[in-house]
């Protein structure tokens, strides 16, 4: 029987494999969530560089948020990331949710990024 960690690793590798198949040179929007915060960054895998990033630990957001672990915080991170991506000239990305299920905070961040102008 596979452990919980094995299942997460297998799911993450499956998602990354699918992303590589459809990326076509587009940067990826990678999302990570912990129990207290949420982090997102846009990564150019060809160059191996981070183009834009945002998290609930940013000084721009930290003072305005009650906590970094709710959907309101994820929405704020998504909007901030979309704003920073547009300044960097990025419109189209591939969404990399990793091993996280597309629900709750991950979904809130993705929808806010779409509203902010990112296409995925």
Curated annotation (Swiss-Prot):
Entry GO MF terms: 5S rRNA binding; structural constituent of ribosome
Cellular component, GO annotation: cytosolic large ribosomal subunit
GO biological process: translation
Swiss-Prot/TrEMBL keywords: Ribonucleoprotein, Ribosomal protein, RNA-binding, rRNA-binding
UniProt keyword Membrane, yes or no: no
Stored Pfam families: Ribosomal_L18p (PF00861)
Keyword presence, Isomerase: no
HAMAP family on file: Ribosomal_uL18_B (MF_01337_B)
Described function: This is one of the proteins that bind and probably mediate the attachment of the 5S RNA into the large ribosomal subunit, where it forms part of the central protuberance.
PANTHER family named among the record's database cross-references: 39S RIBOSOMAL PROTEIN L18, MITOCHONDRIAL, LARGE RIBOSOMAL SUBUNIT PROTEIN UL18M
Subunit-level organization: Part of the 50S ribosomal subunit; part of the 5S rRNA/L5/L18/L25 subcomplex. Contacts the 5S and 23S rRNAs.
Family from the record: Belongs to the universal ribosomal protein uL18 family.
Protein name: Large ribosomal subunit protein uL18
Originating organism: Rhizobium meliloti (strain 1021)
Native organism taxonomy: Bacteria, Pseudomonadati, Pseudomonadota, Alphaproteobacteria, Hyphomicrobiales
Gene that this sequence comes from: rplR
